[in-house]
Amino acid sequence: MKPLILASGSPRRKQLLEQMNVPFTVCKSTIDETFDPTFPPDEVVQQLARQKAQDVAKKHEDSFILAADTIVVFQGRILGKPATEQEARQMLSQLSDQSHEVLTGVALLHQGQVETFVETTEVRFWPLTDTEIETYLQTGEPFDKAGAYGIQGLGAYLVKELKGDYYNVVGLPLSRTVRALKVHGFSTRF
Protein backbone atom coordinates (compact mmCIF):
# COMPACT_ATOMS: atom_id res chain seq x y z
CA MET A 1 0.00 0.00 0.00
CA LYS A 2 1.26 3.45 -0.92
CA PRO A 3 1.58 5.98 1.89
CA LEU A 4 -1.35 8.35 2.44
CA ILE A 5 -0.60 12.06 2.60
CA LEU A 6 -3.09 14.60 3.90
CA ALA A 7 -2.63 17.73 1.77
CA SER A 8 -3.85 20.09 4.47
CA GLY A 9 -2.57 22.21 7.30
CA SER A 10 -5.93 21.96 9.07
CA PRO A 11 -5.52 20.61 12.60
CA ARG A 12 -9.18 19.56 12.50
CA ARG A 13 -8.75 17.34 9.43
CA LYS A 14 -5.64 15.82 10.98
CA GLN A 15 -7.51 15.05 14.23
CA LEU A 16 -10.43 13.50 12.36
CA LEU A 17 -8.21 11.09 10.42
CA GLU A 18 -6.30 10.20 13.60
CA GLN A 19 -9.63 9.50 15.31
CA MET A 20 -10.34 6.83 12.69
CA ASN A 21 -6.87 5.23 13.02
CA VAL A 22 -5.98 6.02 9.41
CA PRO A 23 -2.17 6.03 8.99
CA PHE A 24 -0.99 9.17 7.17
CA THR A 25 1.49 12.01 7.07
CA VAL A 26 0.81 15.69 6.47
CA CYS A 27 2.14 17.86 3.66
CA LYS A 28 0.44 21.22 3.40
CA SER A 29 -0.45 22.49 -0.05
CA THR A 30 0.79 25.94 -1.00
CA ILE A 31 -1.72 26.78 -3.74
CA ASP A 32 -3.39 30.15 -4.08
CA GLU A 33 -6.92 29.46 -2.84
CA THR A 34 -8.61 32.34 -4.60
CA PHE A 35 -11.49 31.34 -6.84
CA ASP A 36 -13.93 32.78 -9.34
CA PRO A 37 -17.03 33.73 -7.29
CA THR A 38 -19.24 33.20 -10.35
CA PHE A 39 -18.51 29.44 -10.33
CA PRO A 40 -21.04 27.13 -8.64
CA PRO A 41 -19.96 26.41 -5.03
CA ASP A 42 -19.77 22.63 -5.54
CA GLU A 43 -17.37 23.16 -8.45
CA VAL A 44 -15.27 25.59 -6.39
CA VAL A 45 -14.66 23.13 -3.53
CA GLN A 46 -13.94 20.23 -5.90
CA GLN A 47 -11.51 22.33 -7.93
CA LEU A 48 -9.67 23.66 -4.87
CA ALA A 49 -9.40 20.16 -3.37
CA ARG A 50 -8.12 18.82 -6.71
CA GLN A 51 -5.54 21.64 -6.98
CA LYS A 52 -4.31 21.00 -3.43
CA ALA A 53 -3.89 17.28 -4.15
CA GLN A 54 -2.07 17.95 -7.43
CA ASP A 55 0.24 20.46 -5.74
CA VAL A 56 1.31 17.98 -3.06
CA ALA A 57 1.58 15.15 -5.61
CA LYS A 58 4.38 17.08 -7.36
CA LYS A 59 6.59 16.35 -4.32
CA HIS A 60 5.19 12.90 -3.56
CA GLU A 61 4.53 11.22 -6.91
CA ASP A 62 4.11 7.66 -5.59
CA SER A 63 1.86 8.56 -2.68
CA PHE A 64 -1.88 8.55 -2.33
CA ILE A 65 -3.01 12.14 -1.68
CA LEU A 66 -6.11 13.24 0.24
CA ALA A 67 -7.11 16.90 0.01
CA ALA A 68 -10.22 18.83 1.01
CA ASP A 69 -11.68 22.31 0.92
CA THR A 70 -14.65 23.58 2.93
CA ILE A 71 -16.83 26.62 2.29
CA VAL A 72 -19.99 28.10 3.69
CA VAL A 73 -22.73 29.14 1.26
CA PHE A 74 -25.35 31.64 2.34
CA GLN A 75 -28.09 32.71 -0.07
CA GLY A 76 -26.01 31.51 -3.01
CA ARG A 77 -22.91 33.43 -1.92
CA ILE A 78 -19.68 31.79 -0.77
CA LEU A 79 -18.41 32.83 2.64
CA GLY A 80 -14.75 31.95 3.07
CA LYS A 81 -12.51 32.62 6.05
CA PRO A 82 -12.95 36.18 7.32
CA ALA A 83 -9.93 38.42 6.74
CA THR A 84 -10.89 40.97 9.41
CA GLU A 85 -12.92 41.21 12.58
CA GLN A 86 -15.47 43.37 10.75
CA GLU A 87 -15.87 40.72 8.05
CA ALA A 88 -16.35 38.02 10.71
CA ARG A 89 -18.94 40.19 12.49
CA GLN A 90 -20.80 40.71 9.21
CA MET A 91 -20.81 36.97 8.42
CA LEU A 92 -22.13 36.03 11.86
CA SER A 93 -24.82 38.72 11.65
CA GLN A 94 -25.94 37.41 8.26
CA LEU A 95 -26.07 33.81 9.50
CA SER A 96 -28.06 34.74 12.62
CA ASP A 97 -31.48 33.00 12.63
CA GLN A 98 -30.82 31.72 9.10
CA SER A 99 -29.92 28.46 7.38
CA HIS A 100 -26.79 28.02 5.31
CA GLU A 101 -24.94 25.18 3.64
CA VAL A 102 -21.48 23.87 4.38
CA LEU A 103 -19.82 22.20 1.39
CA THR A 104 -16.63 20.17 1.51
CA GLY A 105 -14.93 19.03 -1.64
CA VAL A 106 -12.68 15.99 -1.22
CA ALA A 107 -10.05 14.86 -3.71
CA LEU A 108 -8.25 11.51 -3.70
CA LEU A 109 -5.29 11.40 -6.07
CA HIS A 110 -2.96 8.56 -7.04
CA GLN A 111 -0.73 8.27 -10.09
CA GLY A 112 -2.40 11.20 -11.82
CA GLN A 113 -5.93 9.87 -11.36
CA VAL A 114 -8.21 12.11 -9.30
CA GLU A 115 -11.52 11.15 -7.71
CA THR A 116 -13.58 13.94 -6.18
CA PHE A 117 -16.84 14.25 -4.31
CA VAL A 118 -18.77 16.93 -2.46
CA GLU A 119 -20.63 16.61 0.82
CA THR A 120 -23.28 19.19 1.79
CA THR A 121 -24.65 19.85 5.27
CA GLU A 122 -27.38 22.32 6.15
CA VAL A 123 -26.86 24.36 9.33
CA ARG A 124 -29.26 26.77 11.01
CA PHE A 125 -28.14 29.33 13.59
CA TRP A 126 -30.08 30.57 16.57
CA PRO A 127 -31.01 34.26 16.52
CA LEU A 128 -27.82 35.92 17.78
CA THR A 129 -27.63 39.11 19.81
CA ASP A 130 -24.93 41.68 19.15
CA THR A 131 -23.45 40.79 22.54
CA GLU A 132 -23.26 37.10 21.62
CA ILE A 133 -21.54 37.93 18.33
CA GLU A 134 -19.03 40.27 20.04
CA THR A 135 -18.32 37.71 22.76
CA TYR A 136 -17.67 35.03 20.16
CA LEU A 137 -15.42 37.35 18.13
CA GLN A 138 -13.32 38.00 21.24
CA THR A 139 -12.51 34.29 21.51
CA GLY A 140 -10.52 34.49 18.27
CA GLU A 141 -12.16 31.29 17.08
CA PRO A 142 -13.89 32.71 13.96
CA PHE A 143 -10.78 33.80 12.10
CA ASP A 144 -9.44 30.62 10.52
CA LYS A 145 -12.78 29.07 9.65
CA ALA A 146 -15.11 29.37 6.68
CA GLY A 147 -18.24 31.27 7.66
CA ALA A 148 -16.50 32.64 10.78
CA TYR A 149 -17.42 29.81 13.15
CA GLY A 150 -16.19 26.46 14.37
CA ILE A 151 -18.96 24.02 15.25
CA GLN A 152 -16.52 21.80 17.16
CA GLY A 153 -15.62 24.62 19.56
CA LEU A 154 -17.46 27.51 21.15
CA GLY A 155 -19.29 28.01 17.85
CA ALA A 156 -21.48 25.04 18.79
CA TYR A 157 -23.44 27.55 20.88
CA LEU A 158 -24.52 29.35 17.68
CA VAL A 159 -26.01 26.27 16.00
CA LYS A 160 -29.71 25.52 16.41
CA GLU A 161 -30.06 22.68 13.91
CA LEU A 162 -27.96 20.56 11.59
CA LYS A 163 -29.04 18.32 8.71
CA GLY A 164 -26.32 16.09 7.36
CA ASP A 165 -22.80 15.13 8.37
CA TYR A 166 -21.53 16.98 11.48
CA TYR A 167 -17.92 16.17 10.57
CA ASN A 168 -18.43 17.82 7.19
CA VAL A 169 -19.00 21.10 9.04
CA VAL A 170 -15.80 20.48 11.02
CA GLY A 171 -13.91 20.16 7.72
CA LEU A 172 -13.95 16.57 6.47
CA PRO A 173 -16.96 14.30 5.81
CA LEU A 174 -15.38 11.56 7.85
CA SER A 175 -17.49 8.49 7.15
CA ARG A 176 -17.63 9.06 3.41
CA THR A 177 -13.90 9.85 3.24
CA VAL A 178 -12.85 6.79 5.26
CA ARG A 179 -15.12 4.58 3.16
CA ALA A 180 -13.50 5.96 -0.02
CA LEU A 181 -10.03 5.30 1.44
CA LYS A 182 -11.08 1.76 2.36
CA VAL A 183 -12.16 1.13 -1.26
CA HIS A 184 -8.60 2.07 -2.23
CA GLY A 185 -7.10 -0.42 0.22
CA PHE A 186 -6.29 1.77 3.20
CA SER A 187 -6.40 0.23 6.63
CA THR A 188 -9.08 1.63 8.92
CA ARG A 189 -10.77 0.41 12.09
CA PHE A 190 -13.56 -1.03 9.94
Curated annotation (Swiss-Prot):
Coiled coil: none annotated. Its cofactor is a divalent metal cation. Pfam families: Maf. Transmembrane segments: none annotated. Keywords: Cytoplasm, Hydrolase, Nucleotide metabolism. It catalyses: dTTP + H2O = dTMP + diphosphate + H(+); UTP + H2O = UMP + diphosphate + H(+). It is an enzyme of class 3 (hydrolase). One of its GO terms (cellular component) is cytoplasm. It is found in: Cytoplasm. InterPro entries: ITPase-like_fam (IPR029001), Maf-like (IPR003697). Its EC number is 3.6.1.9. The keyword Amino-acid biosynthesis does not apply. One of its GO terms (molecular function) is dTTP diphosphatase activity. The active site is at D69 (proton acceptor). GO terms for biological process: nucleotide metabolic process. Belongs to the Maf family. YhdE subfamily. NCBIfam families: maf (TIGR00172). This is dTTP/UTP pyrophosphatase. It comes from Halalkalibacterium halodurans (strain ATCC BAA-125 / DSM 18197 / FERM 7344 / JCM 9153 / C-125). The gene is maf.
